[in-house]
Swiss-Prot record:
Protein encoded by which gene: nox
Modified residues (Cysteine sulfinic acid (-SO2H)): C43
Active site: H11, C43
Name used for this protein in its record: NADH oxidase
Cofactor(s) it depends on: FAD
Native source species: Mycoplasma pneumoniae (strain ATCC 29342 / M129 / Subtype 1) (Mycoplasmoides pneumoniae)
Length: 479
């Protein structure tokens, strides 16, 4: 019986263990996680804060007990602090006692995920990660300075937003998906909200300005104070350095009763030796093949937020820390360990979606800006159209954008925005087209249906393709 050690038991680790032990009884699994719970869906934190999710416990889909019942040995509140590849052993620290022990493996699975980037309290931005402690409610024990990832963070935010009457103003550092969702939740809870980011537009890493302009407009209409293009210099604290009082930026001070850091994440790979031919990506994630084996290390699998996977759009290894990628990577790694080569994760394209301030947004592949940065000869096609025939009497506006390589006509990415009816699932088949490196001419000939209840003969995707190919006879109506 082969012994497998799994480092990390959240989305990727849970998926791996469930798949492996449901398909085979030939493995002994020892799993370590430094948290006290597993499988928490952090995407639901803002929903719980705003009251959409009534019971925070519903955001869990597995437990250590379930994995133990399947045959795994699961050790919670245990941190892997060292790795010896020659001896095939890990050094594990019990966070409750501080005691360190050694465990040996035949095959290793790194599912250690990523941790929020935290900024230094007093100095300029350092991007230094604070030491993990699952019992800490706040960043660096500074009251009301918090990150957003864990169940523990969710409980703190729920208390701060919905029960703590002293919290009247909230500053959010970062305008990515987490920051924007929390901004909406804080606004729904009646807080004064300021969003601070070095980017010029909210969600500027995920969408181009035709979409971020609409998001900015909706946020300002809701009364959100946007400080875009602003660099954080540090956090303002009380005299005893126990309570945060605001944020210092290069454009002035922002007073706040609660400050949330949602800058981004950094992979937890610090325990992996840097001198043993692992190929690290620029942010510390580890490059893997289509079976999630670390390059140059066939008995080490890296899954979830610690992995850098081939991106079919950029044609580079990318670390895209999404639960969808984590779950799929865990499944593929488990199937390969069992002996199957039929299931493989050949590529990702960063497909994502956002629903805030009445807008439905979705994207896949490269933005126009990123495509240009990657050296493509970029072409774009943007249409504003109604989602179904005007003769139906009721219809909603949709904005759709294609990004492609003008030299080859290869599809590089797409973005979608709808104001009322949600059409974000259209991005699913566009994602497949980007993954398979289809040409926009091929995309235009995909056999899709027409039914006036739902769409047009020349739907907004086809309209964008026709426009890109130079067919000027079709002009979208926009009412």
């Amino acid at each position: 019986m082969k012994k497998v050690i799994v480092i990390g038991v959240n989305h990727a680790g849970t998926s791996f263990i469930r798949t492996l032990l449901s398909k085979s009884k030939d493995f002994q699994v020892n799993a370590y996680d430094r948290n006290t719970n597993i499988s928490f869906l952090g995407c639901g934190i803002a929903l719980a804060v705003s009251g959409v999710v009534k019971n925070t416990e519903d955001l869990f889909y597995s437990t250590p007990e379930e994995l133990k019942a399947m045959g795994a040995n699961v050790f919670m509140a245990h941190d892997v602090v060292g790795l010896d590849l020659d001896k095939k052993q890990v050094i594990v620290k019990d966070l409750a006692t501080g005691k360190e022990t050694v465990d040996h493996y035949d095959q290793l699975v790194v599912a250690s995920g990523a941790w929020p980037i935290c900024m230094n309290v007093e100095n300029e931005v350092t991007h230094t990660q604070l030491q993990f402690n699952h019992t800490d409610k706040y960043c660096g024990n500074i009251k009301n300075l918090i990150s957003c990832k864990l169940y523990q963070h969710a409980l703190t935010l729920i208390d701060s937003f919905r029960h703590d009457k002293s919290i009247k103003s909230v500053a959010i550092v970062g305008s990515g998906y987490i920051g924007l969702e929390l901004a909406e939740a804080a606004w729904q809870c009646g807080k004064q909200v300021t969003v601070i980011d070095m980017l010029d537009k909210p969600a500027g890493n995920n969408f181009d300005e035709e979409f971020t302009n609409e998001l900015e407009k909706a946020m300002k209409k809701a009364g959100i104070n946007l400080m875009m293009g602003s660099a954080v210099k540090g956090f303002i604290v009380d005299a005893d350095k126990n309570v945060v009082k605001g944020v210092e930026t290069d454009k002035g001070r922002v007073d706040a009763d609660l400050v949330i850091q949602s800058i981004g994440f950094r992979p937890n790979t610090q325990f992996v030796p840097k001198d043993r031919q692992f190929e690290f990506n620029r942010n510390g994630s580890i490059k893997v093949n289509e079976y999630l084996q670390a390059l140059n290390h066939e008995n080490v699998y890296v899954i979830g937020g610690a992995a850098a996977i081939y991106d079919a759009a950029s044609e580079q290894y990318e670390n895209i820390d999404l639960a969808t990628n984590a779950v799929k990577s865990g499944l593929v790694a488990a199937m390969h360990m069992i002996g199957s080569k039929a299931v493989k994760l050949e590529s990702i394209v960063g497909t994502n979606a956002l629903h805030v301030f009445g807008l439905n947004l979705a994207a896949t592949g490269l933005t126009e800006k990123r495509a240009k940065m990657n050296g493509f000869d970029v072409g774009v096609s943007i249409v504003d159209d109604n989602d179904r025939p005007e003769f139906m009497g009721t219809f909603d506006k949709v904005r759709f954008k294609l990004i492609y390589d003008k030299k080859t006509l290869r599809l590089l990415g797409a973005q979608l925005l709808s104001w009322n009816t949600n059409h974000s699932e259209i991005i699913f088949y566009i994602a497949l087209a980007v993954q398979k490196k289809m040409l926009i001419s091929e995309l235009g000939l995909v056999d899709v249906y027409f039914l006036p209840h739902y769409n047009k003969p020349f739907n907004f995707v086809l309209a964008a393709v026709l426009q890109a190919l130079g067919f000027s006879y079709y002009t979208p109506k926009n009412k």
